[in-house]
């Protein structure tokens, strides 16, 4: 099986948790976050870590997001940021884009613009209890 490349956009609690899980597997991880301390912390396990704005198309392209098999838009705080990140990933030709959201309204928006999977961990955990 070929080595997969996974992009993580936003390294809050959710994004960091994904990296901690993925680093146990044979995959390349590209991470983008606007906090250099977080990128520096994970640098040993990243194929590439980029400090910058996940809504910046040129930055995502320069980071190599277009080479990813899957990208997780791990920020759910700001709908505009999530929308732009999903749109840019799809424009860059990423085959599978997963987005995290906080509300069902945001979920509908991101599904409408082309996110392949939209998850709401808080909502889903609340439903499963």
Which role fits each region the language model picked out?
Residues 1-129:
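Cytosolic regulatory regions of ion transport systems
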